Every structure is written in structure tokens, then in C-alpha cells.
């Protein structure tokens, strides 16, 4: 369904609804008036309302997903006889409407979606037409289905779009963007009351910025065009936080520091922005892995820019005494200027006071044949156990001796399998527990792995499968270290 006045197909908001207004034109004109770049969404590969389109209402019982596609996800390999019909759809509707959008509305960006529903060569044919029509238009990676390179996945877009609703992120090369929603729906859903808090979404924004990513936050307008008051409140609260802390995410990006006990950091030149998700009880944070000298520190929200007291505790750790308290919405940000931000150590400081979550996405990944979750809730995992050469490694350090309860957070895959967690002389072997994975509704379990006592200094924690399975042993989310 076209949300603009389309001359290509009469199934559009002007010709097919009583509303009769070209909202695309109105949005484009408003963006031009306010100096905002204008982008459009176009589902080039999935069309419920077109007889020749993949996933249409006539041929499939579930137009919203892959299960009803003839032959499954790669239906075009199973049923090549359908390709002429699909090519007709692309030639008569998909490409003409895309070119129409470019000509009539001159968007700065086209956000494509559901490329897996088309053969790759058809997606590339569409991309070629787009580049010919407007060479400098920005196109996301969902124009085509990803393809494998040795050690990585490639795409033909100008930047990478993550999976839907990702809130945890693997380290990535190049430009990328995550697309979380305020609840669990992209369109308006009156029964979906799973809205995240503004504070949660601000943390997602900071975590993405720390790894060089952008956030495209989705809300679903109601049928009359108004925005759900719950969404309005979320956006206003995020806006309030951004008015004070904008520089920490808009001007800053990929950090050279590792994950911290209290949160994350972003970096602009030799200026770190320390995002304090968990305000310490004693009002002091320890910055781990920092080998350069600190020149100055202050609270970003402090209009007087009062210097914060800081001291070096050892060659890798600096302690900063905070001022004020954590805000009601969002989190506090510390500005920390240093001599040389490249002088850091990836060894992660582990707190002896609060629980540490060693996320799989933040591990050093050894071996091959891994599969990764897309980062959304309950799907932020690494599949471990396709071969016994696989290993997830976390390098940590402690400033004082401590004892921890260790637990593994994961989802079991198929039959129980054996894995180990080791750290120096500590070795804990366990058999996976819980119910086998249900693709969409699985929850993680936390399995006790025993008590780990460590002296001050550097240590290496490893998780590895003790046996291999074709479908892996587990979907590992994290290891937990709880001080005793």
C-alpha cells in the first residue's frame, strides 16, 4: 500500500482511501522547511496486496512471515517456475514505484526491507536502478540478503541495518544502525503494552554509540495519525536527556575502553564520555583499562563545569569522585579528558562489590562455525558447540582478592550437552539444562557453575564445549560473576 499519490498503482492513500491526502508530500515539505533530511521506507520484496508479489494474501495463509512462502525462505530455489511471475511484479510495480518516489519526492535515503523474500539477483537489479536514478542516495543493507565473506558477512548497502529490535550489539566494522521499538511492535498495536522505559532506551542508545552505531527508534502511529501518549512521553523524556547530554552520543562514537563495571563510554578525540548506568553507593567510579593520564573530569550536566576529583589507583585504573546524583530519567554522564585515548588495555575491570555480566558479544571469539542471535531480547546469544575448537574468552582483572559465584546464562539446544568454564586452576564442567530452544519464545536459564576465588591481578575466563553437536549445545548469553 502506497502512502503517497502513486501514478504507478491506484492502491494508494489518495486513490483508495477517504483521506485522500498525499502524506508523503506533506512530510517531505515539512522536512524541507525545518532542514531535516528526508527518508522513505519501501518494502521492495514483500507485497501482501499484489497478486504477483511474494507473500500475497491469495497464495499464503500468513502474509506476515516466511513460513507460508512456497519452499520456505529460499522459495526461489525450490520453485523456479514462480520467478517469471515475481519478475513481472518487480518490473510493473516495485521498480516503477521506487523510481517514482525518487523523482517526485527526492528522498535522501531509502530504507528497504525483507530482501530475503526475493532472489538476490532481483534485489541487485532494483539497487542498480536506484543508483542510476540518484547516485548519492543512501541505501540501507536490507536492499539485499547478506552474503558470506571469510570471517564476516557482507552487504551491498551504504550501511548495515541490524536485526529487528536489537538492544545488544556485536562489535562491527563500518557504519551500522539498530532499529529498536518503544514496545515490541513496529506498527501501532493497542494490546502491546510492553513499552520500554525512557531510561532503558537511553542506555541502548549509549551502548550503540559506544560501538560506533546509530539508533533509529521506531514508534507506530495510531490509525488516525496521532501518536500514542505512552510513546509521546517516552520521546519527550529521551529529548529532555538529549538536551543535556547530546554531545555524549551525537558528537562521540566508538570507544577505546572496554565495558566498565558501572556502564559504558563513548569517545570524541581525547575526550571520553562516561555513561554511568549504575550509580555507585559511595559516589565513586573506577575507570578500568585506562593507561593514559587524565587531564580533567566533570559532570556533563553541571553548568558550572566544576572539576571532579580523580586519582590513579594503579597503572590501569583511575578513580573519579562523582557529584550530584543519577537523574530521574536516563543516566549521568562524566566528561573525562585524557592525554592519549588510544592508550588503553582491553582487560576488563571486575568489581568486587556488584555483579558483573560478561556478555558473549563482548568476548574474544575463538574458532569457527558460530551463529549469532540478532540482539533482541532473548536473542542476544552466541551458539556454542558445533565443534570443540570453539571458545569464548574474557580477559579480566581485579584490584583486590575476591570470591564469586559463577553462573552461565543460556538456552539449551536439543539434547543436553557438556561444557566447561575455566579460570586458572578453576574448572567447572556442567551439562546443559532447561527446555530445548523454542525459536521465538525461549527464555534464558542461569546455571550455577560453582565458586571462584581469585587473587588481585589479571585472569582469563574461558567457556568451551566439551563435545560437539551439528546444531550446537547452547545459545550462550553471558557468564555472571556475583561477589560473595
Segments (PLM) and residue ranges:
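Mature catalytic domains of secreted/periplasmic carbohydrate-active enzymes
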Residues: 1-400, 411-439, 447, 451-453, ...
